[in-house]
Amino acid sequence: MGKRCILACMRMIQNIDYSEAKRIVDVVVEEAERLHKAAAIAVADAHGDLICFARMDGAPISSIRIAMNKAWTAARERKATKEIGEKVKHPEKGHDISYYGDPNYVGWGGGIPLWKNGEVIGAVAVSGLSSNEDISLAALGVELIAGS
């Protein structure tokens, strides 16, 4: 009986696969190059674990960890990191980022969850540029999968 309950309670989690993640990184890198910008790009699975990453020549060293943390946060919280950042700026809308109890959580714009068939399958994050540029490039990667 216990075995049946365990099996009945399990749920399959969809994840973005490597080929999709690589396509996202390639498209974002191509657009950043077209704009003469350099950034770090991270694509994570539904759990926030890294699948694909690129740091363009000239991107700040700090952008490496920040991009990975943005992807991790967006996937785990199923929200854009900018939205999380807005809540921590205004305690009446949410709470301090330290509430999460994990230094990986970030509230800077540029991390966006990837939704497919009503479920988060991963996240795309960009770091190293202005917040608006990070968001715009990450959104380009999300649109690549959402539009397919």
Q: Which stretches of residues belong to each language-model region?
A:
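Short, Lys/Arg-enriched N-terminal segments with co-localized hydrophobic residues
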Residues: 1-9
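Flexible, solvent-exposed loop/hinge segments and secondary-structure transition points
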Residues: 9-148
